[in-house]
Amino acid sequence: MQREEKQLEACLDALISQVSDIKNSLVGFIHKLENEYDRLTWPSVLDSFALLSGQLNTLNKVLKNEKTPLLRNQVIIPLLLSPDRDEEIMRLTEGRVPVFSHEVVPDHLRTKPDPDVEELEKQISADATRLTSEAAQKQVQSMNKMCSNLLDKISKEERESELGSLRQNKQTFNPTDTNALVAAVAFGKGLSNRRPPGQGGPMAPGQTGASGMIPGAAGMQQVPMSLSQNQQQQQHMAGVSMSQGSQPGKMPSSIKTNIKSASMHPYQR
């Protein structure tokens, strides 16, 4: 008798520990759903479900263990009923049951489910016993086939989404050509130093060729300017003034006009 009592106490301690773990997991999961719903991800939710499933399987193994006595054969009798508030019961039930009176005992110590639930359980048990092994095997195969088709569709959708993202992110330029173009524009890398045809060899710094090309600046042509043009302009102005002075009836103009050459090149020294 003492051995059975010790075995029952050990079984109850194991069940209480397993149920406490399940309760803590449920509390944590509900807290996440209520307070962290905006940051939750599907992997986190699936991890929580997997944890709860594993804990329920462990509890089921404890109940089905051969060393676990059949709890349905045990009779629970309340030793003390009181309408007054009991602090010890409040602590054990975490504030859920403040009073252990005649009103709450039938609900908390009930060992049988509701009549509707009990009837449904009997119906399911009867259907399970009438099912043959061949029919059960066919149902299992059909279920496995449906799961395989579902997994194939999910994999196909994932592949199509990955291909779509790759098409969108495909490069429309050649990085090598882009780098070469930037290096040529910024540093002159890869550019050939060719001279136009008909031009002489290398010249000393500060000298220009016959074609008026500035050394080191290909494509920039210097406009040749000489002092003879200024002299010609001065002579032309002097001739105009002399002709005006020689004409009868006209007074010579005392206004001096300085005409600058409009073709003066800004780089002319």
Swiss-Prot record:
Disulfide bonds: none annotated. Transmembrane segments: none annotated. One of its GO terms (cellular component) is core mediator complex. Residues 190-269 are annotated as: Disordered. Residues 221-235 have a biased composition (Low complexity). It holds the Pfam family Med8. Residues 1-26, 134-160 form a coiled coil. One of its GO terms (biological process) is regulation of transcription by RNA polymerase II. It is found in: Nucleus. This is Mediator of RNA polymerase II transcription subunit 8-B. It comes from Xenopus laevis (African clawed frog).
